[in-house]
Amino acid sequence: SDVCSSDLLIVDAAQTAGSQPIDVQALGIDVLCFTGHKALLGPQGTGGLYVRPGLSIQPLVVGGSGVHSFDEQHPAQMPTALEAGTLNVPGLAGLCAGVEWILAQGVETLCAKETALAALFYKNIRDLPNVKIYGDPEMALHAPIISLNIGDEDSARIADILWEDYSICVRAESS
């Protein structure tokens, strides 16, 4: 944070929130954005924004807050100031349940398990013919995500095989 002390440090934690410990104070993070439907185990349509105390940001969209619907002025207090429209209460309840489960297990425990599983997967595929792995093989240096291609095979077909034959759930993307 000393390098850019006059600038804001905004971090996209879509892939890491819930699966990696994140100390916003130690890292000097001013704003942390995250989605709820990935490692936080919440439903789609949920997510959040951490804003460092004392930092003032303006909402992109205002109006229709479910909390102060009849007020002429949009609320200025955080986090209500950034809420436009009706709150997704069922979604937030699902996100809360996911976060509670993660905290009960321990983020560090889950992170270690996911890292070990990714390392085991990497170890078992790295020498297979036609496998192209992208990124650093050292799992401790990044989130436990492995990006790969197998020759010219369709990634959706590979994803189906991994799920049906090995119970490995992956996300297939086409290039």
Language model: regions and residue ranges:
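Short, small-residue-biased leader/transition segments that mark boundaries at the very start
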Residues: 2-5
